[in-house]
Amino acid sequence: MAHKKGASSSRNGRDSAAQRLGVKRFGGQVVKAGEILVRQRGTHFHPGVNVGRGGDDTLFALAPGAVEFGAKRGRKTVNIVPVARPEA
C-alpha cells in the first residue's frame, strides 16, 4: 500500500460549517414567548426569570417581554421583564 499520494493530491481541504452560536436577542429587545435568546455550548449564560434552557443549553423566552442581561451569584443570567402595554 502506498503511503505517498500521487501528484496533485492532498489530504487537506476539508472544514466544518460554523455552528452559528452566540446572543440572538440583545438587552432591551422585545421578544415573544419561544424566541431563542442565546445559542451556546455549555452554560455561559444561565436562565433567569421567564427564560428556559433547552437540551443543548440554548436559552429561550418563556413569556413575552424585554430581554435583560444581569448577574446573580457571580453568574451571567438572562431575564425576560414583562412590558406594560398602553391601555387603549
UniProtKB/Swiss-Prot annotation:
KW Ribonucleoprotein (keyword) present: yes
Keywords assigned by UniProt? Ribonucleoprotein, Ribosomal protein
Any idea which GO molecular function terms this record carries? structural constituent of ribosome
- Key word Ribonucleoprotein present: yes
Biological process terms in GO annotation: translation
* Family designation: Belongs to the bacterial ribosomal protein bL27 family.
Recorded protein name is Large ribosomal subunit protein bL27
Q: Kindly list the organism's lineage.
A: Bacteria, Bacillati, Actinomycetota, Actinomycetes, Mycobacteriales
